[in-house]
A protein has these predicted regions:
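M14 metallocarboxypeptidase catalytic domain recognition
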Residues: 1-180
């Protein structure tokens, strides 16, 4: 448990890597040191300084765990309370949840969905148009999750859409009167 060594796979058809997500199976209440190696070649090596990984026992509630970075290796030091623990770069946002968000948002009269194309994996690239386009209205673009490891952006978009599509929110109604 004191010398688990891992490396991060490169993104699909790319030389970049930064994001990780894995499950540890072990005895509970035993201290572990998980070393993620070769990070000086990652997409953003400076991002590992003062970084804290996230962990979860149920894949719903995530919490931060202490880490140390020596310039090339990230050491996650943690004593799990249960036999199965999930670790990630940031709280994962599953493709299933992504599809649920798209399905939910298109039920609003203020939102429509368009397919712009496909990813390298053959999945739809979706555009959500929120509001009713009219001459004189401003057009605002918000992009998120353009890279595989940017799960935090989709969490932001989920909250953004919940607020923007809330029929009882005065600020959202005002924004949609002024912009699309």
């Amino acid at each position: 448990p004191l010398n688990i060594q891992l490396s991060i796979r490169k993104d699909n058809q790319s030389e970049f890597y930064q994001w990780f997500h894995f499950k540890l199976e072990s005895q509970s209440f035993i201290s572990h040191q998980i070393k993620v190696t070769d990070l000086k070649k990652s997409a953003y090596p400076e991002g590992w300084q003062n970084y804290r990984a996230v962990a979860s026992y149920d894949r719903q509630e995530w919490f931060r765990v202490d880490c140390e970075f020596d310039g090339d290796t990230l050491t996650i030091a943690h004593t799990p309370e249960f036999e199965h623990t999930y670790y990630a770069y940031f709280a994962p946002y599953s493709y299933e949840r992504h599809l649920d968000l798209l399905s939910w948002s298109q039920q609003s009269p203020d939102c429509r969905q368009e397919c712009l194309g496909e990813t390298l994996d053959g999945r739809d690239i979706s555009l959500l148009v929120v509001g009713q386009p009219q001459e004189g209205k401003k057009v605002i673009w918000v992009t998120a999750r353009q890279h595989p490891g940017e799960t935090m952006a989709e969490w932001l978009i989920e909250g953004f859409l919940e607020r923007l599509l809330d029929q009882d929110d005065g600020l959202s109604r005002f924004l949609l009167d002024e912009a699309v």
